[in-house]
């Protein structure tokens, strides 16, 4: 599906943002591994999260939808042998966290995914899990899906420092460590998003976290999990597209309610404020251990910034849309130390730069990042290939709304991976000036 967008738009609206993808994934996983029945309200019915549901159904979890809630009857970490390959679709979260979970099960299972997921590296997860006693076989290409996993009942505890901060790798190790024979210690620098730790603590897991010698340290003891009642807040990674839309379009304001404000996820807000963005946060409260609140963003004159390397894990999913904001800012923006972008759904350094250049932006590739010389006057309508990367498709669409003329986004249907009704909301709420 290709989408044409007529530019010079503005938006003044309260926007309903989809539920958080990270928490939706983990709610299914924790519910499936817990004792009792977990109820999930506001679940994100997007392709990635549906892949997680389908995989856990194949592993014996009873999952049904009742009155707009997802009901999960837990298996108490005793999953069933799957009779089919576990198809993870496009979801790296599903794959990598499942590798940790399946490491605790005394059976073999095969994980596979689509052509994009098959290119993403998996040894970063399998190597530490192998140290704990699980076995892995790459069936076609080294380091890539499909993978055969053979778990073990009594895994060895691990003391492991992540070479690169990653919520997915960290979470896989935590899920495995819950069934190890003693205390495991996992460290990372800087700290990545901590939804797994918070949600598992809520479910009764014996997990302690602290900062030690600059590192974020997690201690995990063997634990059973209890069922939860979860209300999933709105996803700040999805909200970021409409926040930036309001900032770069004239006479615009966006209000987003019940949005997750976990400090490990709000890097995009902090950096946009450094750039001069008019953003207000209000109505802050705690739900299931997570900060949530209302975000209001208004048209702003932005300036370029140098992004601190310690903020990269907090904005790793938002870098394409941050780059769009940078293209409209006065001056130079540098985003570096972001090698993780190379192994996302696309090489997001290359695809983000190509997107910006197709709209006329001046930008340069760094070894592990981007340099963007902002100038609203240089920007014009363009044609952009999404490379089937949902965040590239949506970032390009936001940029298209703020420039003169008609732009075309190729293969735009991939937005549904995380934001099923993105174009309906974007074109419904924004109007031609």
UniProtKB/Swiss-Prot annotation:
It catalyses: 3-phosphoshikimate + phosphoenolpyruvate = 5-O-(1-carboxyvinyl)-3-phosphoshikimate + phosphate. One of its GO terms (biological process) is aromatic amino acid family biosynthetic process. The active site is at residue 317. One of its GO terms (cellular component) is cytoplasm. Keywords: Amino-acid biosynthesis, Aromatic amino acid biosynthesis, Cytoplasm, Transferase. Pfam families: EPSP_synthase (PF00275). It is found in: Cytoplasm. Pathway: Metabolic intermediate biosynthesis; chorismate biosynthesis; chorismate from D-erythrose 4-phosphate and phosphoenolpyruvate: step 6/7. 3-phosphoshikimate binds at residues 21-22, 26, 166, 168, 317, 344. The keyword Cytoplasm applies. It comes from the Bacteria. HAMAP family: EPSP_synth. Belongs to the EPSP synthase family. Monomer. This is 3-phosphoshikimate 1-carboxyvinyltransferase. It comes from Caldicellulosiruptor saccharolyticus (strain ATCC 43494 / DSM 8903 / Tp8T 6331). The gene is aroA.
């Amino acid at each position: 599906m290709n989408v044409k967008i007529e530019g010079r738009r503005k938006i003044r609206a309260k926007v309903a943002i989809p539920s958080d993808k990270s928490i939706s994934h983990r709610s299914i996983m924790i519910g499936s591994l817990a004792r009792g029945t977990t109820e999930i309200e506001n679940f994100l019915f997007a392709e990635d999260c549906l892949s997680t549901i389908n995989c856990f159904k194949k592993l014996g979890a009873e999952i049904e939808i009742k009155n707009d809630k997802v009901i999960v009857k837990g298996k108490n970490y005793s999953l069933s042998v799957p009779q089919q390959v576990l198809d993870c679709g496009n979801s790296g979260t599903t794959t990598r966290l499942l590798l940790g979970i399946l490491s605790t099960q005394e059976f073999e299972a095969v994980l596979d995914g689509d052509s994009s997921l098959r290119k993403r590296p998996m040894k970063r997860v399998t190597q530490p899990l192998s140290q704990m006693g699980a076995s892995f076989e790459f069936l076609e290409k080294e380091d890539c899906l499909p993978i055969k996993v053979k778990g073990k009942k009594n895994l060895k505890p691990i003391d492991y420092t992540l070479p690169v901060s990653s919520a997915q790798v960290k979470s896989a190790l935590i899920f495995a460590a819950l069934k190890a024979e003693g205390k495991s210690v996992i460290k990372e620098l800087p700290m990545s998003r901590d939804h797994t730790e918070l949600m598992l603590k809520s479910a009764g897991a014996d997990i302690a976290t602290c900062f030690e010698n600059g590192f974020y340290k997690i201690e995990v003891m063997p634990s059973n999990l209890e069922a939860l009642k979860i209300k999933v807040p709105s996803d700040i990674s999805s909200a970021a597209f409409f926040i930036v839309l309001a900032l770069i379009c004239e006479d615009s304001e966006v209000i987003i309610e019940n949005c997750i404000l976990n400090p490990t996820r709000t890097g995009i807000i902090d950096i946009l404020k450094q750039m001069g963005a008019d953003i207000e946060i209000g109505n802050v409260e705690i739900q299931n251990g997570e900060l949530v609140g209302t975000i209001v963003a208004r048209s702003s004159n932005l300036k370029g910034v140098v992004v601190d390397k310690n903020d990269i894990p907090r904005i790793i999913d938002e870098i394409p849309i941050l780059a769009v904001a940078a293209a409209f800012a006065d001056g130079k923006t540098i985003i570096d130390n972001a090698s993780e972008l190379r192994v996302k759904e696309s090489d997001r350094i290359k695809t983000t730069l190509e997107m910006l250049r197709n709209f006329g932006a001046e930008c340069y590739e760094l070894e592990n990042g981007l340099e963007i010389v902002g100038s609203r006057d240089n920007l014009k309508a363009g044609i952009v290939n999404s490379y089937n990367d949902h965040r590239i498709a949506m970032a390009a669409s936001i940029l298209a709304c703020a420039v003169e003329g008609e732009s075309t986004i190729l293969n735009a249907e991939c937005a549904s991976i995380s934001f099923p009704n993105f174009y309906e909301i974007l074109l419904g709420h924004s109007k031609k000036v």
